Design a protein with these regions (language model features):
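Mid/C-terminal beta-alpha module of Rossmann-like enzyme folds, strongest
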Residues: 24, 230-291, 306, 320-322, ...
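N-terminal Rossmann NAD(P)H-binding glycine-rich loop of SDR-like oxidoreductase domains
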Residues: 27-47
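Conserved catalytic-site region of short-chain dehydrogenase/reductase
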Residues: 100, 130-140, 183-189
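Short-chain dehydrogenase/reductase
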Residues: 103-107, 150-162, 182, 190-194, ...
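Conserved Rossmann-fold NAD(P)-dependent oxidoreductase catalytic core, especially the SDR/UDP-sugar
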Residues: 111-159, 176
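Conserved beta-loop-beta element that borders a ligand/cofactor-binding pocket
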Residues: 129, 162-187
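Substrate-positioning beta->alpha
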Residues: 188-195, 209-232, 239-243
Length: 340
């Protein structure tokens, strides 16, 4: 029954896309408090979709736009997730946990999201990252780049992606798998980037991982959400990873300068958090220890090739310039830093 429903829905999506208009969806977002999950909920509602924001129980709900249904769901409980997404047509699994908790919770949350999407007959959407590739073999990385993760987190993510792709091939779910660089934007600040925003507002030195003069890539959370919705509405993009790059590669120090300029501060003094410091702090901090194994990306960056996205969707990926996205993020952080 679910396979037939998915086939009918895919045909309807194709028909709506051919007419140049998105098909209205019933969309549940797991991890709707987060940086990307919150953006997906907002953008989907703005696009006219019926949105259910699934948040952890026992905490105050963040302010969501009018019209978004907010429900509590414990992602560690399969029964809770099944109930939270009941009746939905799309399940976006955007829930995250702190790095030290990945081995325990990332596979568990993934299994429960998959089971819930399958039970609901829903499309499963899983935002991917670049950890699955390991170290880059080329300047720009396309979807066919070897997947050779050398980190614990990379191997965990690869196992989850392979499980989801196999479920798609077996007809259990329809899978959408956009792959992003580091996401930034209003809603939350990643631990690696928070010292930059704090330093900019105080006009003090900031900390940056490994190499501030290497290239890096970021994508605004609203752009990532918009691209995700586009891929959901593009059946040819289902069942495969599709890269969604940022607006351009940028030297990390130049990104930091944009943050300081937006704050009205002077030229930033950047103190690089080197490998030795990571190892030293990691003796006492599980978070620093876990962050260090993926810090190589700030010295040996993965820059995503967006050719496939353009080919499948017929247009460019959303691309807010850093000169626009950074001030927008800083404005949010200025008023929300206590909870960011």
């Amino acid at each position: 029954m679910h396979r037939a429903r998915r086939r009918i829905r895919a045909e309807a999506v194709t028909l709506f896309a051919a007419r140049g208009c998105p098909m209205p969806m019933k969309l549940a977002v797991l991890g709707a408090r987060g940086l990307l999950g919150g953006a997906v909920a907002r953008r989907a509602r703005l696009a006219g979709h019926q949105v259910r924001a699934v948040v952890r129980p026992g905490r105050d709900s963040p302010a969501f736009p009018m019209g978004i249904e907010v429900v509590a769901g414990d992602l560690s409980s399969q029964a809770s997730v099944l109930e939270a997404v009941r009746g939905m047509e799309v399940v976006v699994h955007a829930a995250t946990v702190p790095y030290p908790e990945w081995p325990r919770f990332v596979p568990l949350f993934a299994d429960n999201a998959l089971a819930a999407a399958e039970a609901a007959g829903a499309t499963l959407v899983f935002p991917g990252n670049v950890y699955v590739y390991g170290r880059p073999r080329s300047r720009f990385v396309a979807e066919d780049h070897p997947q050779e993760p050398h980190t614990v987190k990379g191997r965990i993510r690869l196992a989850v992606e392979r499980k989801f792709l196999q479920a798609h091939q077996d007809g259990r779910v329809d899978l959408v798998l956009p792959r992003y660089p580091d996401v930034y934007g209003p809603g939350a600040i990643h631990a690696d980037f928070r010292p930059v925003f704090e330093g900019a507002l105080a006009n003090k030195p900031c900390r940056w991982p490994l190499n501030a003069d290497a290239l890096h890539e970021f994508i605004l959370n609203d752009d990532a959400a918009e691209a995700m919705l586009k891929l959901i509405g593009t059946p040819a993009a289902h069942g495969r990873a599709v890269h969604v790059p940022g607006p351009r590669a940028i030297v990390s120090r130049d990104f930091i300068r944009l943050v300081y300029a937006a704050a009205g501060s002077g030229e930033p003094i950047v103190r690089v958090f080197g490998r030795g410091m990571y190892r030293l702090v990691g003796l006492f901090s599980p978070l620093a220890r876990a962050a260090y194994e993926v810090a190589y990306l700030f010295d040996d960056p993965i820059l995503l090739d967006g050719t496939l996205y353009r080919s499948l969707t017929g247009g460019p990926h959303p691309s807010t310039p850093y000169e626009v996205g950074v001030p927008r993020t800083l404005d949010w952080f200025r008023t929300h830093r206590a909870i960011a």
